[in-house]
């Protein structure tokens, strides 16, 4: 199970992200259920982890505009297992998207310092 807290009306969790060169950094990510990819990170974190560039990706933002993202490869410690993921570069705070949470249940106590839990769903 992954846990976090609600701060300033944002549900957040801490994730350990690793680059192919072995560099590791813990990031605080805001959970965004409207974001369909796995994770976005700011350029400074991507550079610090020395993440390898993979490709470009287009996305529709919440305001309806289209944006082109650089996409990088990373590993993330997710509920005790290492997952290979694609990371969007975005000049904003890190976002945790729905793709990484697939197969998990998200619960949020929507109040200041409320508990956030992401728990693996039982297999069918």
Go through each PLM region and give its residues.
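Pepsin/retropepsin-fold aspartyl endopeptidases
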Residues: 1-124
């Amino acid at each position: 199970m992954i846990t976090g807290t609600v701060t300033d009306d944002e549900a957040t969790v801490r994730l350990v992200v690793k680059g192919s060169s072995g560099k590791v950094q813990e990031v605080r990510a805001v959970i965004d259920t409207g974001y369909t990819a796995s994770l976005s990170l700011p350029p400074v974190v991507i550079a610090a982890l020395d993440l390898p560039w993979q490709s470009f990706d287009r996305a529709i933002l919440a305001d309806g505009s289209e944006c082109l993202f650089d996409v990088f490869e990373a590993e993330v410690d997710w509920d005790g297992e290492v997952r290979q993921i694609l990371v969007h570069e975005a000049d904003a705070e890190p976002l945790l998207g729905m793709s990484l949470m697939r197969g998990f249940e998200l619960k949020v106590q929507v109040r200041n310092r409320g508990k956030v839990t992401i728990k693996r769903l039982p297999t069918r």
